[in-house]
Amino acid sequence: MPPPLRHRSMRIFVNDDRHVMAKHSAIYPTQEELEGVQNMVSHTERALKLVSDWLDDQEKGNAKVNALDTDGEGDKETEPSTGEQATRSLRGVMRVGLVAKGLLLKGDLDLELVLLCKEKPTITLLKKVSDNLAVQLKQLVTEEKYDVKPCIRDATIVIKNAKEPPLTLTIHLTSPLVREEVEKQAAGETLSVIDPPDVLDRQKCLTALASLRHAKWFQARANGLRSCVIVIRILRDLCARVPTWSPLRGWPLELLCEKAIGTGNRPMGAGEALRRVLECLASGILMADGSGICDPCEKELTDAISHVDRQQREDITQSAQHALRLSAFGQLHKVLGMDPLPSKMPRKPRSDTPIDYTVQIPPSTTYVPPMKRPIEEESTDEKNPNKKKKKLQKKSPDEKAEPAQAMNALMRLNQLKPGLQYKLISQTGPVHVPVFTMSVEVDGKNFEASGPSKRTAKLHVAVKVLQDMGLPTGMDQKTTELMKVDEPVSTQETLPPVIKMEPEPVPITETPTDENARQQGPILTKHGKNPVMELNEKRRGLKYELISETGGSHDKRFVMEVEIDGQKFQGTGSNKKVAKAYAALAALEKLFPEGSNSEVNKKKKMPPMHTGFGMVSGPPSDMMPNPRGRGRGRGRGRGRGFNNGGGFNQGGYGTYGYGGNNSGYNFYNNGGSNGGSVASNQGTNQSSGGAAATGGFGSYYQSDSSYTSPAPTPKPVGKKPPMHQNTKPQAPGVGQGGSYGQYNQGYGQKKNFGQTQGGGGAAAGGGGNFNYSTAYPSQVTGGQEYNYEGYSNQSNYNSQGGANQNFGGNSAPYNSGQAGYGRGDPNMNYQYR
């Protein structure tokens, strides 16, 4: 089984990935530079630990002297003071900035640490720590020389080394008490504690505390996000090269990248992630009327880009739009400031050890914060569980690859029971959508399962056997969560790989373990249809409502509800589309259990009210389309006319209107208006095209003239395009305007072609926000949704129809007002599903 599509870079972004990774390797620090940084940081941390011990010994010695000088009455007063001395003056040292986040680039020479103090840091403490730190560094490190200088104005200690490159390490002194005091003042409380006269600048201490929060947030949210750190490094280099981008440098850039990449519904490669960030900026998020960037590390609502003025915001937005155009037309190397790569790169030998680009410097093991020393004395292995948790957290976005684990079920069963004989029981369904049923006998017990291929059916059989034996199947443990959620028995959850289950009833009773085996396929009714589409045929105008949304960003659970005749049906899934399908499936099985194929066929056999242009002499008596006829593709030809020489509808695959002749819907001209009447088939909710516009292929530009293609000569098609999955042959003359496939149900309130009622033109005026979907499920075609979940007025990235992108709220296509850049209605979004 091939690797899961979710973790493969989209094919259209492969070139971008190559350029981004090539640029990243060029700006990434060398191993020598990283070793120099690591040595300086670790030396300083160890020296600060010795300084903390020295201060602790001094304070304990003073406490003992005070205790000896006092009498019995005074002992009661000294007990609290000795208790306070048990806590060190220096609480710990933490890495912040580029070192903590792993964002170092070539030439970055400034490193930062934060030294936490028990009390508010003072000038006296700063000088004492600085003097002793120089002594400890000389004793600790003999091969290198460090210059230590206190900077009272900035509340820091600056350390410089004498080697090349000349690194500068800044230690910021601060204390949590500084922020607590500010919060109390803001709440109107009176402060009883009087600060010492030589206390350090409060604002500098607050800034150091903020940098500490930023580092912790980044490690929790951005480090585990695929491609996020790489994109931030690329954009840091862009901010250094292009002055327009410099106001975004630092914390705002990190927030923006995490927000743009983290809201995606799947892991993305570096090229796609960079384009998503550029789209986010180009949409106007920085503009005065945009959504802005909220600082998640502040209790009060704080704008992280408040320091950027209006002109700078406009300049950055314009630059991002220009960069987005360049990347869309294959000129990403100009944005990155590099030469274009050759089309074929020589493969590097894989013997080289791969570089871990996420973690530049390993975490500190020499310095342990003093406040946690008692715990460490009890158990030295106490840190191991935390490390494991962090590793699991970092892996969590990549753990969405459940299908990769599912393929191990067959291997696992073969290891446990070698020599099993899998038998093909039956093969049903049409030639283009076969359904295989395989069986295997294990310990005298027979197991059966179905799938679109023999290999997939064998996998399903193996899953059932392992479940019956009570062994893990290799799937993720999401099934346990499914059992906890109160949902109808008929609901199942779909996982990314496209494995179609047999719609016929299986003799084995359906149990929660059966649900596990059926998890991998699309959600279909007993007729092999999308449940939402079939329910819409029976009851129109249904409204689906989102009841609840639970789980973290990597494991969402949605509950959708639909009400029919006073009865409410709920469905649960990993996204709204899946939950909606489950709700529709529950309603169908409850309200329409007697639905049969014969009824559907009767409805489909109704003759069309109007014959389209593609119908030369009406439908033939043979109801089945020619399986080997040409023009059966799904309109992938970008304007090329497919002549359906052998089919019954002479307009390409006639009812789709994709072919060279004018049949069905023709949206290439006059703004998406069909120009003819439409007959609505009440039985199947499918509209058949009337007199279509005679324009043929419309112009790419806004003009009244258009090119009308003559009937092309029969042209051999090199490859037989796949037919629709799990759909039956269409009745003659009945247009497929109702739905382009079983997976055309979009999110939200997007309308389908088939929902137009009446006879006044199915899509007159080009209105509505139509959602294009391929006939196959999205997991087969590799299509993935590419829209923003966190930004308003965000359009979808258009890969097939040209540059039909919208930035902000402008719904017009790239070049023209009403004529779309690609084929179809200009408001028709070609999006990844």
Swiss-Prot record:
One of its GO terms (cellular component) is nucleolus. Keywords: Antiviral defense, Cytoplasm, DNA-binding, Nucleus, Phosphoprotein, Repeat, RNA-binding, Transcription, Transcription regulation. Residues 629-639 have a biased composition (Basic residues). PROSITE patterns: DS_RBD, DZF. Residues 373-385 have a biased composition (Basic and acidic residues). GO terms for biological process: defense response to virus; spliceosome-depend formation of circular RNA. One of its GO terms (molecular function) is single-stranded RNA binding. Residues 775-818 have a biased composition (Polar residues). The modification Phosphothreonine is found at T70. The keyword Nucleus applies. Residues 402-471, 527-593 form the DRBM domain. Signal peptide: none annotated. RNA-binding protein that plays an essential role in the biogenesis of circular RNAs (circRNAs) which are produced by back-splicing circularization of pre-mRNAs. Within the nucleus, promotes circRNAs processing by stabilizing the regulatory elements residing in the flanking introns of the circularized exons. Plays thereby a role in the back-splicing of a subset of circRNAs. As a consequence, participates in a wide range of transcriptional and post-transcriptional processes. Binds to poly-U elements and AU-rich elements (AREs) in the 3'-UTR of target mRNAs. This is Interleukin enhancer-binding factor 3 homolog. It comes from Danio rerio. The gene is ilf3.
